[in-house]
Amino acid sequence: VVVEEGATVEDAVLMDGVVVKAGAVVKRCILAEDVVVGAGAKIGGDGAIAHVGTGLTVGAGATVKEGAKVFDSVKEGEEVC
């Protein structure tokens, strides 16, 4: 697992191979193996746990809302509820 300087990870489970880029915020979520979280992306929140599936990429500046279950990569700047 790699969490770059400036990234925030709080109350989250990060499986093997996960990379969280600088400026990303990961909160109350489960990231499966080999997930890449782009710079400035936001995953989860204070509510229900968000899930991101194996090998997916959450692009730079993208948002995955609390409680979301993600089975496909999320494009840069995209929002998933």
Language-model region placement:
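Left-handed beta-helix
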Residues: 1-81
